[in-house]
């Protein structure tokens, strides 16, 4: 729908096919959380807190480098993974197109800004200083509109990636909340029915008795409606999106926005703050902090007997890739940890802290 409308509006055929736009958005969606460390946002918070409490390691770094670590961001880690870490010996990493990389970048700015910027796309940052040159090349290639030094307005298709993310995680989290006992089936039905469109969805629901099937049906209907609504809002606001004057989430200017806010409120109060979730987050802080304690000491600390042991646990090519820069060495440690799953990070922490021995 969106691809066809763009091709027709701008006379792009036959060089550009409508499905090309969908392919770019799909690739960016697939990659959008690739930079998240173990334990998700709790892992990001743990890494920020660790660097903030170890200021000695930040001495000698420039303001941009310090901001990268003090405000550690999974979105920037994702750009680094896609463009470098997936294939470190080959410039360009995963060899994605500039269109995909720009669409992936929800927050196309550096971490340290002289003057604060407003708008949804400036809430976080999207690349580390280590990749600043590459990000600028991507921005220039696709024609992102400069906004400030090291900052641009979003690629238009990024708004669709953001809408897809909001659609999936909010709707599916409610379904997960029912399975975990955090949300009652009746409450979930009420929330999802509102998103699904009310009367028509309710008429079909009368023929479904199994609670699980009822939730699954409403989830599918809600996602379908949100997809259609995202496409409609995008096309209605295309001109403002293209010139940079539109800088909100698509659903913020949609009739479904209020319903989504109700879902978000329930998710935050009953799911994200549930005891079992808090216990995982607490564990995440301890695990991430413990791994950083050892690995950063080994990479950047004084040559004590303990630190030499941790240094020997770093990858064989660590020195070659990071060199003498403490900034790059700490980014390299962050790369290692960000590449771990939750369970692997816990297992590594238990072994390396002596809670259990290998073998």
Where on the chain are the PLM-derived regions?
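Sequence-structural signature of the catalytic-core scaffold of metal-dependent phosphohydrolases
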Residues: 1-27, 34-218
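Surface-exposed helix-capping loop/turn segments at secondary-structure junctions
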Residues: 5-13, 297-304, 355
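Composition- and surface-driven signal marking solvent-exposed, interaction-prone regions
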Residues: 173-186, 242-246, 301-307, 349-353
């Amino acid at each position: 729908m969106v691809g066809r409308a763009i091709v027709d509006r701008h006379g792009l055929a036959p060089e550009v096919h409508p499905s090309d736009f969908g392919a770019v958005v799909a690739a960016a969606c697939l990659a959008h959380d690739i930079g998240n460390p173990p334990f998700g946002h709790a892992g990001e918070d743990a890494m920020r807190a660790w660097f903030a409490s170890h200021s000695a390691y930040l001495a000698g770094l420039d303001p941009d480098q310090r901001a990268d670590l003090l405000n550690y961001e999974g979105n920037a880690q994702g750009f680094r993974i896609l463009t470098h870490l997936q294939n470190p010996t080959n410039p360009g990493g995963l060899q994605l197109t500039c269109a995909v990389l720009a669409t992936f970048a929800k927050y196309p700015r550096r971490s340290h800004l002289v003057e604060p910027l407003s708008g949804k796309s400036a809430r976080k940052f999207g690349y580390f200083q280590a990749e600043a040159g590459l990000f600028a090349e991507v921005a220039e290639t696709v024609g992102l509109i400069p906004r400030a030094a090291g900052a641009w307005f979003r690629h238009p298709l990024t708004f669709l990636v953001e809408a897809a993310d909001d659609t999936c995680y909010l709707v599916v989290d409610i379904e997960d909340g029912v399975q975990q006992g955090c949300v009652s089936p009746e409450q979930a039905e009420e929330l999802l029915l509102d998103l699904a469109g009310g009367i028509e969805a309710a008429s079909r629901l009368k023929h479904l008795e199994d609670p699980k099937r009822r939730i699954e049906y409403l989830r599918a209907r809600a996602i379908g409606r949100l997809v259609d609504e995202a496409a409609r809002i995008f096309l209605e606001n295309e001109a403002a999106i293209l010139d940079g004057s539109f800088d909100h989430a698509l659903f913020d200017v949609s009739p479904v926005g209020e319903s989504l806010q109700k879902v978000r409120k329930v998710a935050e109060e009953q799911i994200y703050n549930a005891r079992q979730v808090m216990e995982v987050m607490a564990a995440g802080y301890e695990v991430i902090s413990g791994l950083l304690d050892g690995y950063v000491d080994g990479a950047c600390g004084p040559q004590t007997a303990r630190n030499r042991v941790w240094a020997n646990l770093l990858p064989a090519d660590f020195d070659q890739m990071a060199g003498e820069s403490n900034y790059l060495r700490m980014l390299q440690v962050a790369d290692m940890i960000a590449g771990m799953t939750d369970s692997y990070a816990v297992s590594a922490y238990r072994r390396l802290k002596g809670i259990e021995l290998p073998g």
